[in-house]
A protein has these predicted regions:
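Glycine-rich anion-binding loops of enzyme active sites
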Residues: 1-54, 193
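Acidic, glycine-rich loop-and-beta core segments that form the ion-binding/anion-interacting portion
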Residues: 34-81
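Glycine-/charge-enriched secondary-structure boundary and capping motifs
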Residues: 7-14, 66-84, 88-204
Length: 204
């Protein structure tokens, strides 16, 4: 990992790893089951999650000269509250869908953003077509983009932009998947669809 300002001389980083077992029937993605028209469902992030902190620190502290207790414009939060928002867990709303075989793929949106993470779960014959009007980029990300001089294409490849997880469901199951997510108080929405392509992400 590259985390400027975190690894100080004489300090060490201790990392933990979890190894698990999954039933073969539950493995995702199911590439052979994916087809044009399958629905992309977005789940919101709670903030930066684990990516974009070097940019955020540069913008907030170096460029804008903000303190941790200063308000972060447009967010209704302090800089500390916005940047230290806990990476939310998607286990509770998503695992029942996995166990019920309601999904054909899912992508955790980490470093690389939507542009790089979704293709990891796509066959080479399909593209993920993202409807950019389906959600509003949260104020935190808009602030970082504006003050950091980050264009939308670069932002899509560096930040989650408010989308923390993307689920892929068959078209005839998408409504039921959305209903289950909403019943679990998950504010999910239709983010886009799969179209013929080469395993990339396209924005509309």
């Amino acid at each position: 990992a590259e985390m400027p300002g975190v690894y100080a001389e004489g300090e060490v980083d201790v990392a933990g790893t979890i190894v698990g077992v999954v039933d073969e029937a539950d493995l995702l993605p199911r590439l052979e089951a994916m087809a044009e028209g399958d629905v992309l469902i977005g789940l919101p992030s709670s903030g930066l999650h684990t990516n974009g902190y070097s940019l955020a620190r540069k913008v907030c502290f170096d460029l804008e000269k903000l303190g941790v207790n200063d308000p972060l414009p447009g967010t209704g939060k302090t800089v500390a509250e916005a940047l230290l928002a806990i990476h939310r867990s998607y286990l509770a709303p998503v695992m029942p869908l996995v166990k019920a075989h309601q999904l054909v793929a899912m992508a955790h949106i980490t470093g690389g953003g939507l542009t790089d993470n979704i293709p990891r779960v796509l066959p080479k014959t399909l593209d993920a077509e993202i409807d950019t009007a389906s959600w509003q980029i949260p104020a935190l990300f808009r602030f970082l983009m504006e003050k950091g001089g980050l264009g939308i294409e670069d932002a899509r490849q560096a930040l989650n932009l408010g989308v923390g997880m993307v689920l892929v469901a068959k078209a005839d199951r998408a409504e039921a998947v959305l209903a289950a997510l909403h019943a679990a108080e998950e504010p999910a929405w239709v983010l886009g669809r799969l179209v013929a392509g080469t395993g990339s992400v396209v924005y509309r």
